[in-house]
Every structure is written in C-alpha cells, then in structure tokens.
Amino acid sequence: MGINFDVSRPKARSSINMTTKFHTIGLIGKPHHPGTNQTLKRLHHWLTVQGYEVLVEERVASELGTHIVAVDLLEIGARCDLAIVVGGDGNMLGAARVLARFDVGVIGVNRGNLGFLTDLPPDAFEEALAKVLDGEFDTEHRFLLEAEVYRHGMLKASNTAVNEAVLHPGKIAHMIEFEVYIDNQFMYSQRADGMIVSTPTGSTAYALSAGGAILTPNLQALILVPMFPHTLSCRPIVVDACSTIKMVVSPENGENLEVSCDGHVHLAVLPGDEIIVRRSSEQLRLIHPKGHNYFHVLRSKLGWGSKLF
C-alpha cells in the first residue's frame, strides 16, 4: 500500500537587499588543504583586526595556530550572524545542510573548481567582503530537499540536500526498475540507472551533467532527470517545488540501492522501499556581494559567449 502525503505550499522568498551589519563571524573550510588554510588565516587576521568576534570550525581550527576559538558547525549556526565557507561547492553544500536550520547568512570564498555558490576570490576577497560587512549585499534564499526512505510504511532513514537527491544502485552501476509518482499521481515506470531529483541550485551540478535543464535560482520548481533511461522517449521533467515525489522500487531489484543527498550522505534502500522527496522547510540564506548577477556567473563558469555589441 502506498503512502499518502498532504502537500502544502510554503511561501516563496525572493532575493532581497539587506543592510544588517554583522558582529560574530564563523569560518569554515576544507580540512588539510594548503590553499584553504592560507585563506582562512588571512580571513581570521583581517576580521580580528577589525574587531569582529571570530569562531572557527573545529576541523580546521587546529591548522590555524593558537588564539583560535574552535567550535563545531552547530555552534557556528547558533552563535554567528555570518558564516564564511572557504573551499568549493562541495564544502558549501556540506556546511549548508547544517546551517540552513539556523538564521545565519552564508557566503563563500572559492577554493574549488567552478564555484557556483562561492562568490569571493581567494586572493583578493578584502574589498568585496568589506562592502558586505558594511551592509552592502544581496540576500538570496535557496530551498532544500528532504529525502525519506520508507520500508513497509515505516520511516527508515532521512536527510536533506541542497543540490539533489539521487536514487541509484550501490557501488556497481546497473539498471534498476522503479515507479514514479507526483503528488500521489502515477507518472511512469522507469528502467534506468537511477533518478536525479534536483533543486534549481542543483540544476547546474549533477542534473546538468545528466542532460537536465538549468533552472534559475528564483524558480519554485524541481527537475527530475532520469539517468541513462532504457527508452528514447524519456526526458527530464520540471514540476512545481511543492510537489511530493514518490519513487517505489520494484521488488525484483537486487539489494544495495541507495539514495544520495548531494553525494555526501547515503541512505540505504531495499527492493520494495518507497522514497519520498519533497521541499524541506529549511532554506539556505546565501549572501552575495551587491549587484550579483546569476547570468554573469553562468557565462563565467560555463564558458558562454560574451556580448557581441
């Protein structure tokens, strides 16, 4: 028997300007990364000289020397007005899944590859960050996903994702069979290597590599992207962000299936399980330098052509 869910429609939040200044700032970074450590040291010194209270995430605090206030990620969320993540999008995603439950702004310094979520350059962050700290910034809310695995009607595992929740085989890729329902309405059965359910934030990540469309961050939508479907007619589909996605795994599948959240957290799935993916009540409060332009980011990161005239 399937599980029925009441679908509610939360209010959308648009990008807004903020003028609130910050007092307590948290520093988060990729552990054991020389470039990240260098940037974190510069940030800590620069912020401390200006009189800010600075808390450093405990996994990187020991690498920054003495006179460092080390705390865990939950304490950064509870105590800080602003969290600065130094690293790539993966580091931002890991921090965001925790910080989204708190009312803390998050901004990134790019020490990764593409860096869709990390705006500030690592070697010249001071000018842009100074303006942000003076209240010259834009705030953008990005919604998260909640993924749940049910077995015989009982919740077995759950977690959140900023980018995507992916149903897939375990360590060895192979075709799996499952049914997909949107708001308890049957959409189709699928034979594929898996299914990506992505937010607009994640539409430039794994979903893009699998042939999905790019969704602008302000869209209240989800995109479902099949992975190597065994039919030529199967294409990605965009649905309302308030939709509840249910995937029912065929009892004929082998074991060792998983649901991955942002590629970081893995939930075990058995044949016959039901996977529910829906919009989370949590939102990431991203801070951008004032005048942030999403299409400039796409041109820069994806190598799109510049203006002709």
From Swiss-Prot:
Its cofactor is a divalent metal cation. The active site is at residue 89. One of its GO terms (biological process) is NADP biosynthetic process. Pfam families: NAD_kinase (PF01513), NAD_kinase_C (PF20143). It catalyses: NAD(+) + ATP = ADP + NADP(+) + H(+). GO terms for cellular component: cytoplasm. One of its GO terms (molecular function) is ATP binding. It is found in: Cytoplasm. The keyword Kinase applies. Its EC number is 2.7.1.23. InterPro entries: ATP-NAD_kinase_N, ATP-NAD_kinase_PpnK-typ_C, NAD/diacylglycerol_kinase_sf, NADK. Its main location: cytoplasm. NAD(+) binds at residues 89-90, 163-164, 174, 191, 193, 204-209. Keywords: ATP-binding, Cytoplasm, Kinase, NAD, NADP, Nucleotide-binding, Transferase. The keyword Ribonucleoprotein does not apply. Belongs to the NAD kinase family. Involved in the regulation of the intracellular balance of NAD and NADP, and is a key enzyme in the biosynthesis of NADP. Catalyzes specifically the phosphorylation on 2'-hydroxyl of the adenosine moiety of NAD to yield NADP. PANTHER family: NAD KINASE (PTHR20275:SF0). This is NAD kinase. It comes from Shewanella sp. (strain MR-4).
